[in-house]
Each structure stands twice: as structure tokens, then as C-alpha cells.
A protein has these predicted regions:
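Acyl-donor-binding surface of acyltransferase catalytic domains
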Residues: 1-27
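Hydrophobic adenine-recognition pocket in adenosine-nucleotide-binding enzymes
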Residues: 34, 110-112, 145
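A conserved beta-strand-loop-helix scaffold within acyl/acetyltransferase catalytic domains
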Residues: 47-112
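Conserved acetyl-CoA-binding loop of GNAT-fold acetyltransferases
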Residues: 157-166
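Conserved GNAT acetyl-CoA-binding A-motif
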Residues: 133-145
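Conserved acetyl-CoA-binding loop-helix of GNAT-fold acetyltransferases
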Residues: 109-112, 118-135, 154-158
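Conserved beta-strand-loop-alpha-helix junction that forms the acyl-donor binding cleft
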Residues: 143-153, 169-180
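A short beta-loop-alpha structural element at the N-terminal edge
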Residues: 30-42
Length: 201
């Protein structure tokens, strides 16, 4: 589970170019795209890791954010990983948000059920969603995250994302200094140094 006692600060990452990598899932897992009715399953997954106070709240968020945008088809942009029982165990969304009144690509809600973490599912989901951006030629790709998602941040920089000192998108205030100071306190020295090698002005 995420340690939400870690202070919250906005971290912005951006990927300008991506070398396509074939995602690999262990036997028993496979990708599938969003289908009607999956919003409840997505909501249960997000509630399970504590991102929302209730399943209903998460479901309403998904519907209002992703199912009402005519310009973007959620069935082509929301990727799930399912297990042998066809249960959703992970998800990630290839979306878009405004930056200076122009839509830019944004990777949303990379999440893996706690009991399925450590199996490479998050990495595979990230790679699968990045393929969507590649096919649609939608670069740069932005991510908004926070220090308590430090494991995901390390994954992102290993996939080619750079932590932004000043750049941002949507309504997010870039809180680079506060965020990096927080990460320095919680990460092993070698992991923090890896992040510092992936900072962009």
C-alpha cells in the first residue's frame, strides 16, 4: 500500500521520445481494453489502494472524467491487465489534458492491486499505454504524480520520462523543490541519485 503519511507535492514528468518496447506479462495474465461496465471494476481497484473514499466516488469520477469526452474514446485508451479468472488486477489510461489551451498527452492512473504488485504488471501497463501514444503520435507525454508514488516515479524515469523543474500542464503547480527534498528523505541514496540524473529544466 502507498504510504500516505509522506507529504504531498506535485511532481511533473515528461517524455519527449519513446523507444517502443514490447510489454511482457507472466503466464496467466493478459491485456484487455475497457468495455462497458468496467468503470465499477476500475473503481473497486482504485478504492482498494486508497485513492478514493468509496467505490461509488471512484466510479462517478471515472464516468465524468473518461466516459463523457466525445473527442477521446475510452475503449481505445484504458488498458487493463486481467488474471486467469478475468479479474482486473491493474489499469492505466492514455489520456489528454490542456497545457496552455492545447491538448497534450497524459498518462493517468497507473495502478496495480496490492496482492499482484511485484510481478512486473505496472511496468507492462506503462509500456502498453506508451504504445498507444506512439501509434497516435501524441508526444510529449506528461505525468502528474506525488512523492508517495516513489516506486512509480522510478519506473517512469526508467521508461524515458524526465522530472521537470519548471514545466507543467493542466492545473498543476510544479512543486519540484519540495517534492525532491521529500524524495531525498525517503529513498535509498542510489535511487535518489538515479532520479537526479533524470531531471530536465
Amino acid at each position: 500500500m502507498l504510504d500516505r503519511t509522506i507529504p504531498f507535492y506535485n511532481i511533473i514528468l515528461r517524455c519527449d521520445r519513446y523507444l517502443t518496447t514490447t510489454p511482457v506479462l507472466h503466464n496467466g495474465y493478459e491485456f484487455r481494453m475497457y468495455q462497458d461496465g468496467d468503470e465499477r471494476k476500475w473503481a473497486q481497484l482504485e478504492y482498494e489502494i486508497g485513492d478514493f473514499d468509496s467505490v461509488d466516488e471512484a466510479e462517478q469520477y471515472f464516468i465524468s472524467t473518461y466516459c463523457s469526452k466525445k473527442a477521446l474514446d475510452i475503449t481505445e485508451r484504458c488498458v487493463f491487465v486481467v488474471n486467469e479468472k478475468n479479474e482486473i488486477v491493474g489499469s492505466c489510461i492514455a489520456w489528454k489534458e490542456l497545457r496552455n489551451d492545447i491538448l497534450v498527452a497524459s498518462l493517468h492512473w497507473l495502478v496495480v492491486s496490492p496482492q499482484y504488485q511485484g510481478k512486473g504488471i505496472g511496468k507492462a501497463l506503462c509500456q502498453k499505454v506508451m504504445q498507444i501514444f506512439v501509434v497516435n503520435d501524441e508526444f510529449p507525454v506528461y505525468i502528474h504524480t506525488q512523492p508517495w508514488s516513489y516506486k512509480a516515479i522510478i519506473l517512469y524515469v526508467r521508461q524515458g520520462f524526465k522530472i521537470q523543474k519548471t514545466d507543467s500542464f493542466s492545473q498543476y503547480e510544479n512543486q519540484f523543490n519540495f517534492a525532491m527534498n521529500t524524495l531525498k528523505k525517503i529513498l535509498p541514496e542510489n535511487q535518489y541519485e538515479e532520479l537526479t540524473y533524470n531531471i530536465e529544466l
